[in-house]
Amino acid sequence: MKTLLLTLVVVTIVCLDLGYTLTCVTTKSIGGVTTEDCPAGQNVCFKRWHYVTPKNYDIIKGCAATCPKVDNNDPIRCCGTDKCND
């Protein structure tokens, strides 16, 4: 009986995948691209092309709770798997 109970606990933990954290590519470091484990509640990676001039833009990447709203008609792409915003 103890073996059955222990087996059920192990199977439950494996199936629930406790502690999963989304990993997104970020542009927080100056001139560099890194990855970041998103904080709890932030389950979306995003990539935004922020236009400075019509032919010049910055790419901003990171984690978010929801897909950020578009400002100034900047294109944005959101996704929900590890490093999908690369």
Swiss-Prot record:
GO terms for molecular function: toxin activity. Its main location: secreted. Binds irreversibly to M1 (CHRM1) muscarinic acetylcholine receptors, and reveals a slightly weaker effect on M3 (CHRM3) receptors. The mechanism of toxin-receptor interaction comprises at least two steps. The first step is fast with no competition between the toxin and the antagonist. The second step is slow with formation of a more stable toxin-receptor complex and inhibition of the antagonist binding. Belongs to the three-finger toxin family. Short-chain subfamily. Aminergic toxin sub-subfamily. It is found in: Secreted. SUPFAM superfamilies: Snake toxin-like. Negative results: has no effect on M2 (CHRM2) and M4 (CHRM4) receptors. InterPro entries: Snake_3FTx, Snake_toxin-like_sf, Snake_toxin_con_site, Toxin_cobra-type. Residues 1-21 form the signal peptide. The keyword Secreted applies. It comes from Dendroaspis angusticeps (Eastern green mamba). Gene3D superfamilies: CD59 (2.10.60.10). Expressed by the venom gland. GO terms for cellular component: extracellular region. It comes from the Eukaryota. This is Muscarinic toxin 2. Monomer. Keywords: Disulfide bond, G-protein coupled acetylcholine receptor impairing toxin, G-protein coupled receptor impairing toxin, Neurotoxin, Postsynaptic neurotoxin, Secreted, Signal, Toxin. PROSITE patterns: SNAKE_TOXIN (PS00272).
